[in-house]
């Protein structure tokens, strides 16, 4: 039985001499060397990838630095990054060409279901061009604003990017953000106009937009259809011609940058590394510049797109490294690895991911606490940008306060908990991290600093003990067709945004820049923007620090008792409308009692909104058939006194499902 192994595609000149040769045949057997038919002997030495039967180690020394290209694919969400990555993998023979090749690099179930990339993935492509063997290291990056941290991290290991733009939709907000990330990192940018096969595609209009917004000549744009594979070969040519090889030194001591890491329960941490200097091989003793811990390298290799062990990794190459690290915190993102007893100057790392949204997470049933704790620990090993603090609530029990990069990040994390660990949770309304400048010497002594960050609204300090409150702000970019500009400007003003800039990209499209309080966009701004613009507007934001704000802590009271789970921090101007809405939702969710329930929203001692749940009424006059009116009055008076007493001593127990209903509605609103 013989197995036919497909060969990688090269460019036309490289393919020509091979067209008449026989196909490469591989005899079965335990790790036997490939045998050839009539094909030239040199073919065997050109074999650079392995089938499932052959896990022989690759010799990476065959690729000199000048034949290496490290690049990322960046784009707005749904502009075809992952589809282009699939075609590049097929063209270079990394994967077989089949109809099932959709989102090959997107390995998470949530990524495939939502059709988005959440975690950046790496693949090493081997490509023959003009008789030379090239090593192309591809990093497929996410497109959604919440995961821009993944993009900036991936770019640190690259020398160039493919900036993919949809020929139908044109430049969108995330396209602009990704371009400037690449521009600031001084990377070569190759604009690729995708989806030219669509009926409404207008590549010439998109070329003009790219020239106007990014100052890239229109003749540098490559027009392709990643879905059909049209003109994708020219993208590979452009990568070789326009992206420079990495500037590295193989004779210097090892310097490797950890730009990502994942956790495997059997092998420990798998660190994705980019080598800037030196060589690393199995058995080497390496030291982390961050923790100063020493490890022994168990395995090195490249991702092709699955793990492919190699003898060594050389400077300029991107691959993975397993060294017995038991915790992802040991493989700190941005850390520098060097050889033991050969210390080097650490590489400039990254800014650590800063959580923008916080939410409480509790198990549906407290008996599931330990299982959920284990699931969160395992998931955070693969997602170091999530912060975890223990928390507890009278109504919901023990839980955690989690920090996320954005609302989609929170939804994806929750979905992964359900799918991968079968865990059901209650998520409280998301909040943002506020700051308070303290004036109380007692509080300053307690916190050991004058400026504190508040991630839990229940811990918001009183106004009398604070000089000023600060709220996080972001610089938002909105790109929209011009007919929706007026409506969108009104929406932004209603969200307390300040306009910073307005540019016409072409005759029909406008780019607006606004400074937003983060709290105003974190829950439902994106949905409102999409509905106002019939789905055509796109939105992206970047951190812009903090600004002074008139913030107040709003308590929700049930018969005068504070419900801690529903405490919120709001802007003074919006306190009444938000308080009224929460009271109305709580009224609809609470079961009636034998006594009246007063639901109140309060700022300090001032009540700003109220709703009442009427009591069940028992007819105490049913047994009276006529008779003196004073008898009836006496019975009614006794009933009123009993209800008054019951109201004082009767605790209003808020059922868990009522909490879930209020919190979910608040999030969806």
From Swiss-Prot:
Gene Ontology biological-process annotations: positive regulation of translation; translation
Broad class of the protein's primary localization: mitochondrion
Disulfide partners: none
Residue stretches making up the tr-type G domain: 66-247
Disease affiliated with this protein: Developmental and epileptic encephalopathy 40: A form of epileptic encephalopathy, a heterogeneous group of severe early-onset epilepsies characterized by refractory seizures, neurodevelopmental impairment, and poor prognosis. Development is normal prior to seizure onset, after which cognitive and motor delays become apparent. DEE40 inheritance is autosomal recessive.
Pfam family, one: GTP_EFTU_D2
Protein biosynthesis among keywords: yes
Keywords: Disease variant, Epilepsy, GTP-binding, Hydrolase, Membrane, Mitochondrion, Mitochondrion inner membrane, Nucleotide-binding, Protein biosynthesis, Transit peptide
Broadest EC class assigned to this enzyme: hydrolase
Residues annotated as transit peptide in the record: 1-49
UniProt-listed HAMAP family: LepA
InterPro entries per the UniProt record, alphabetical: EF-4, EFG_III/V, EFG_V-like, EFTu-like_2, G_TR_CS, LepA_C_sf, LepA_CTD, LepA_IV
Family label: Belongs to the TRAFAC class translation factor GTPase superfamily. Classic translation factor GTPase family. LepA subfamily.
GO CC annotation terms, alphabetical: mitochondrial inner membrane; mitochondrial matrix; mitochondrion
Binding of GTP, residues: 75-82, 140-144, 194-197
Protein name in the entry: Translation factor GUF1, mitochondrial
